[in-house]
Swiss-Prot record:
Transcription factor that regulates the expression of the gene cluster that mediates the biosynthesis of apicidin F. Binds to the eight-base-pair motif 5'-TGACGTGA-3' called the 'Api-box' that is found in all promoters of the apicidin F cluster except in the promoter region of apf2 itself. The gene is apf2. Disruption phenotype: Leads to the loss of apicidin F production. GO terms for molecular function: DNA binding; DNA-binding transcription factor activity. Apicidin F, like the other known apicidins, is a cyclic tetrapeptides with anti-malarial properties via histone deacetylase inhibitory activity. Belongs to the bZIP family. Highly divergent. This is Apicidin F cluster transcription factor apf2. Residues 1-27, 65-84, 219-239 are annotated as: Disordered. Keywords: ANK repeat, DNA-binding, Nucleus, Repeat, Transcription, Transcription regulation. It is found in: Nucleus. Residues 1-13, 75-84 have a biased composition (Polar residues). CDD domains: bZIP_YAP. ANK repeats lie at residues 241-270, 274-303, 307-336, 357-386.
Amino acid sequence: MSPPSQDWSTITDANERRKAQNRVAQRNYRSRQKLRVELAEAILYDMPSWRTAVGLKRKRWLETPQSVEDHDTNPDSATPKPSLSSQVIQYHEEGQLVQNPTDFSMSADADVTADVSSGGESSDLSLGVFTPGDDWMNAEIDWTAAMTLAGDTSASEPDLRHRAVGPGNDIHAQPPVSIPVQAASGQHRTLTAPTPAESMSLRTEPPETAVITVTSNREVPNLGDSNEGSRSISTTKQPSEFKTPVLTAIAKGKLDIARLLISSGANIDTRDMHGRTNLHYAVSRSDAKTVRSLLELGADLLMSDASGVTALHMAVGADDQDMVKLLLGWCEQQDRTASSTDHKTTLKQCINSRDGQNMTPLHLCVVMERMDMLKILLDYGADVNIGCD
């Protein structure tokens, strides 16, 4: 048990003095919290929806007007704590509210506490005068109805609910329940009380995990209407591409392991459900290192997905000039090292390939008005006469 404030000077140990001060501060905090709870029960006593919750405490308010903190009151104090029920609420014999809860203020005479930095000297903690505020609101009580009963019509219902719940919590939409209430002035008002589900929803809940699908919109040529220069298509990016041992080896930079797997029968051009290969995904990520490794291991650059889109179409659509130069440069190198003239057609086939709409990368670039990309394709010999059917 902590010593009185006048005996703190006898405690020479700083840790013991600090513990004693903390105990007094905690006792004062509990005292204030109990006062606030009693005040809330008094305000809501005449509300029909809450009569059951506080009905058992009516007798204490009417017949036993004593401080709720008698056990914490300093016995040496000349002025004991005032009775909360005598200051806050007065009732007729019928139990009707006759004093407006907002017309009074309550002064909390806190116990004497000590300042830790004062070296053991005690200082009085004066709380001053406080009125019902946001700091003691209970989220499970309908404070909208309480404020309306008290005559506070300056704030709207959403604002009052914001006070009760706080800015960080959400209120689930529930059908409100209307209840009639008779105020002290005799006027009948209709208040909105929360449903049980709404009361439960006022408590803070952890956020739920959401699954997000990333969608990118790109402008591509509109072949159906010659008056429009472009159209927008939605390309949904899968959360993760399919993985194979070969691709794992490439991702780790172990091309010797990848070659061993390929020589053992591994297919480097395995398609997924959309017809895309590892090369398609590497190009879409602008992963030049993986693209170069896949091409060196024999990936087919001319393979298209279910929509007829090749890796070059994908790079042109993304306006990835470096990737386009990498793909076309690799095709040009393949043609230079080809043994016969018949096999020197890789660049031509790649740059003039058509997608599902019979569009070449050059045609796609023209419709999307990408001048720099168009110059790159022309430098590599793209055919300007190939059109759509």
